[in-house]
Amino acid sequence: MAPLIPGELLPEPGELELNAGRPVTTLSVANSGDRPVQVGSHFHFAEANAALQFDRTAARGQRLDIPAGTAIRFEPGDSRDVNLIPFAGNRRVIGFNGQINGPLDA
């Protein structure tokens, strides 16, 4: 067996399917602003920048269905469909733009 290298990653062979089996909501999003808007993987999408136009009610309690630590950037005038998945765990949303600051299912 080869010696271990500090910090080395030893992934299992094959592919990982992110968020397997989670319900997906697809929404059309448009940036109506004059500056780019970037939204991170775990941001409560309903509270995203006001320049983004989309169904915020449908986005309540959801985040982007993208790998953790990544983001989607919307350039001015850009429009695209995004996939959202529900927050899991205890489903408490604290911070962001302060619109919820508590349980999503209350």
From Swiss-Prot:
<keyword id="KW-0963">Cytoplasm</keyword>
<comment type="pathway">
    <text>Nitrogen metabolism; urea degradation; CO(2) and NH(3) from urea (urease route): step 1/1.</text>
</comment>
<comment type="similarity">
    <text>Belongs to the urease beta subunit family.</text>
</comment>
<dbReference type="GO" id="GO:0035550">
    <property type="term" value="C:urease complex"/>
</dbReference>
<dbReference type="Pfam" id="PF00699">
    <property type="entry name" value="Urease_beta"/>
</dbReference>
<keyword id="KW-0378">Hydrolase</keyword>
<comment type="subunit">
    <text>Heterotrimer of UreA (gamma), UreB (beta) and UreC (alpha) subunits. Three heterotrimers associate to form the active enzyme.</text>
</comment>
<dbReference type="InterPro" id="IPR002019">
    <property type="entry name" value="Urease_beta-like"/>
</dbReference>
<dbReference type="GO" id="GO:0009039">
    <property type="term" value="F:urease activity"/>
</dbReference>
<dbReference type="InterPro" id="IPR036461">
    <property type="entry name" value="Urease_betasu_sf"/>
</dbReference>
<dbReference type="InterPro" id="IPR050069">
    <property type="entry name" value="Urease_subunit"/>
</dbReference>
<protein>
    <recommendedName>
        <fullName>Urease subunit beta</fullName>
        <ecNumber>3.5.1.5</ecNumber>
    </recommendedName>
</protein>
<dbReference type="GO" id="GO:0043419">
    <property type="term" value="P:urea catabolic process"/>
</dbReference>
